[in-house]
Amino acid sequence: MQHPREENSIVVELEPSLATFIKQGFNNLVKWPLLNIGIVLSNTSTAVNEEWLTAVEHIPTMKIFYKHIHKILTREMGFLVYLKRSQSERDNYITLYDFDYYIIDKDTNSVTMVDKPTELKETLLHVFQEYRLKSSQTIELIAFSSGTVINEDIVSKLTFLDVEVFNREYNNVKTIIDPDFVFRSPFIVISPMGKLTFFVEVYSWFDFKSCFKDIIDFLEGALIANIHNHMIKVGNCDETVSSYNPESGMLFVNDLMTMNIVNFFGCNSRLESYHRFDMTKVDVELFIKALSDACKKILSASNRL
């Protein structure tokens, strides 16, 4: 019998500075948005609004929006969840299956419901207190992924709720919603001594390998773009940016990308320190090829799960 959820690890042995570069890139670039734009529309439960919003913010949405991973990571798409639930004598709890899940196209603000796996019925979110016929508890709320712009156009697409109530409650809380992009990394990644390890969760209802490939492809593209955009100051070294003096051969390392790339070519650098190093040894295209080969190796390892 296949379990709905399994914990696994994907391990590849790489040159240590390259492994560190990929780990740091993953942690800094692969940002899965949280549901931090939450609005409670109605609540007669014993849990206060803040408790509901905190619980909903951290719903593991990647296992629901798995068909849209790449566009969510590039922020071409966002998503929202909606819950409207009343306590009954027979149903005295709420699971993740009780929510409706929608993908948001950020170009058009179109809102499209996605299918939800029946396995979500096994994930408990809230238990109501003892049922009483004359005081049944209800909850209605909506939460958007971080970075979603709430405007008249997108609100007009929320045909499943009372727009007047939404506008009133949103106006009450919008000043306390964090304007920054709030996110989590999809996986824990470590790289001790070049042993790059992804700790992942595999679910039975979707093709994890395909989703993992979407993530690694996004990461590789973002890292290569960052490499091409990276600059090292040439001339007298100062301690505000990474800089190199060709006459003295002194390199000042002030960022992680410089540190990892020069270490790949034989330097033993640390952040915020000076090193004597011949920068002509650095071949950016060779480093990019090594990065692409490493990503292929990671995907090959994931296929063995």
UniProtKB/Swiss-Prot annotation:
Catalyzed reaction equations: RNA(n) + a ribonucleoside 5'-triphosphate = RNA(n+1) + diphosphate
Record-listed E.C. numbers: 2.7.7.6
Keywords assigned: DNA-directed RNA polymerase, Nucleotidyltransferase, Transcription, Transferase, Virion
Keyword Transferase applies: yes
EC top class, as a word: transferase
An individual GO BP term: viral transcription
GO cellular component: DNA-directed RNA polymerase complex; virion component
Gene Ontology MF annotations: DNA binding; DNA-directed RNA polymerase activity
Location relative to the cell: Virion
The keyword Nucleotidyltransferase is assigned to this record: yes
Protein family per UniProt: Belongs to the poxviridae DNA-directed RNA polymerase 35 kDa subunit family.
Function: Part of the DNA-dependent RNA polymerase which catalyzes the transcription of viral DNA into RNA using the four ribonucleoside triphosphates as substrates. Responsible for the transcription of early, intermediate and late genes. DNA-dependent RNA polymerase associates with the early transcription factor (ETF), itself composed of D6 and A7, thereby allowing the early genes transcription. Late transcription, and probably also intermediate transcription, require newly synthesized RNA polymerase.
Subunit annotation: The DNA-dependent RNA polymerase used for intermediate and late genes expression consists of eight subunits 147 kDa, 133 kDa, 35 kDa, 30 kDa, 22 kDa, 19 kDa, 18 kDa and 7 kDa totalling more than 500 kDa in mass. The same holoenzyme, with the addition of the transcription-specificity factor RAP94, is used for early gene expression.
Protein known as: DNA-directed RNA polymerase 35 kDa subunit
Species this chain originates from: Vaccinia virus (strain Ankara)
Name of the coding gene: RPO35
